[in-house]
């Protein structure tokens, strides 16, 4: 669908179709137009308008259609679809307006600066080499693991880190510890229990021991932690509304990190609207 045909839809329908609200879409178009005007050699003009190039890219990330399908829908060559998607993604990331915050986020209440971390897995095609490196025993398939660091007070994702599916969540957390070392508390699930040894104050459920049932106070504490921590599950759900992250990833793995960071930045923008 071309951009001109979207004018008849309401704002809520536009977001459902495209994946982002109209104001965010307009800002992305502005970034692409600025980049186009700064080109020293314009070269051959693109068959599609800037708005349609962005729409094609968002359609790819949101619905994860094959590039052949997109080529047929937009009446361009399949290779042109691939170049367009890559160009739009690169321009948005280089603009720094659609990236995750680089500086440590602080709030007025410095006595309780905290983050929530969680890892989610995205299935990939079976690699030709090093299959065991990407095999997830939990999911029983080959995956890439994405660790999401969320700052509840600012309502922003402040970091997304990628590793192979076989790596344990806590190992990935220890590799990226610099991103949340300024925080007093880290809220996690029981898979991150060992982070306590690294000097972090963990907010996590109390584990039930064999033959020792939890007291009512401990059960209430676990419920309270669960109610607060569920926000990270909602964030993971928002990320996976873009089917490129929820379906089996068919592309080369080297651009997976760029794409999930771009999608995380879009989720941040939508949550701050």
Across the structure, where does each feature detected by a protein language model lie?
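Charged, often Cys/His-bearing segments associated with DNA-binding zinc-finger transcription factors
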Residues: 1-42
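Glycine-rich, flexible loop/turn motifs
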Residues: 2-5, 10-13, 44, 131, ...
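Short, amphipathic alpha-helical "recognition" segments used to contact nucleic acids or chromatin
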Residues: 49-63
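Short secondary-structure boundary/capping segments within folded domains
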Residues: 17-19, 45-48, 59
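Short, well-ordered secondary-structure "scaffold" segments embedded in the functional core
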Residues: 50, 64, 69-273
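A short glycine/serine-rich beta->alpha loop
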Residues: 40-46, 249
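Short, small-residue-rich loop/turn micro-motifs
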Residues: 32, 60, 206-208
């Amino acid at each position: 669908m071309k951009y001109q045909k979207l004018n008849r839809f309401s704002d809520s329908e536009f977001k459902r179709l495209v994946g982002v609200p109209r104001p965010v879409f307009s800002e992305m178009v502005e970034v692409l137009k600025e980049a186009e005007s700064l080109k020293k050699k314009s070269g051959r003009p693109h068959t599609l308008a800037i708005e349609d190039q962005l729409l094609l890219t968002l359609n790819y990330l949101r619905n994860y259609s094959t590039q052949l399908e997109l080529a047929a829908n937009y009446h361009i060559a399949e290779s042109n679809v691939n170049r367009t998607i890559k160009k739009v993604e690169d321009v948005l990331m280089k603009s720094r307006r659609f990236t995750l915050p680089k500086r440590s986020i602080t709030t007025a209440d410095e006595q309780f600066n905290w983050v929530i971390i969680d890892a989610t897995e995205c299935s990939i095609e079976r690699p030709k080499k090093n299959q065991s490196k990407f095999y997830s025993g939990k999911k029983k398939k080959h995956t890439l693991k994405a660790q999401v660091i969320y700052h509840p007070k600012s309502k922003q994702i402040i970091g997304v880190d990628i590793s192979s599916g076989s790596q344990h969540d806590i190992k990935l957390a220890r590799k990226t510890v610099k991103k949340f070392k300024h925080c007093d508390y880290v809220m996690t699930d029981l898979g991150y229990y060992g982070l306590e040894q690294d000097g972090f104050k963990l907010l996590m459920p109390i584990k039930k021991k064999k033959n020792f049932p939890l007291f009512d106070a401990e059960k209430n504490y676990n419920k309270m932690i669960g109610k607060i921590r569920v926000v990270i599950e909602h964030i993971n759900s928002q990320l996976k509304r873009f089917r490129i992250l929820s379906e089996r990833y068919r592309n080369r793995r080297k651009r997976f990190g760029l794409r999930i960071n771009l999608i995380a930045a879009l989720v941040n923008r939508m949550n701050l609207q």
